[in-house]
């Protein structure tokens, strides 16, 4: 089952997105 991993990854990325949005792109 990879549902938990997917949810955790989504929250993790949403938390990093605003902080590393400029560096990511």
Swiss-Prot record:
Major location category of this protein: mitochondrion
One MF term in the entry's GO annotations: superoxide dismutase activity
Binding site for Mn(2+): 9
Cofactor(s) demanded: Mn(2+)
GO annotations of cellular component type: mitochondrial matrix
Disulfide bond residue pairs: none
Substrates-to-products reaction catalysed: 2 superoxide + 2 H(+) = H2O2 + O2
Annotated cofactor note: Binds 1 Mn(2+) ion per subunit.
Enzyme class: oxidoreductase
Keyword Transport: no
EC number: 1.15.1.1
Keywords: Allergen, Antioxidant, Manganese, Metal-binding, Mitochondrion, Oxidoreductase
UniProt subcellular location: Mitochondrion matrix
Function (record text): Destroys superoxide anion radicals which are normally produced within the cells and which are toxic to biological systems.
Subunit text: Homotetramer.
Note, other: On the 2D-gel the determined pI of this protein is: 7, its MW is: 24 kDa. Could be used for the diagnosis of allergy to Pleosporaceae.
UniProt similarity note: Belongs to the iron/manganese superoxide dismutase family.
Protein name per the record: Superoxide dismutase [Mn], mitochondrial
């Amino acid at each position: 089952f990879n549902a938990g991993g997917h949810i955790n990854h989504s929250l993790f990325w949403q938390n990093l997105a605003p902080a590393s949005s400029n560096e990511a792109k």
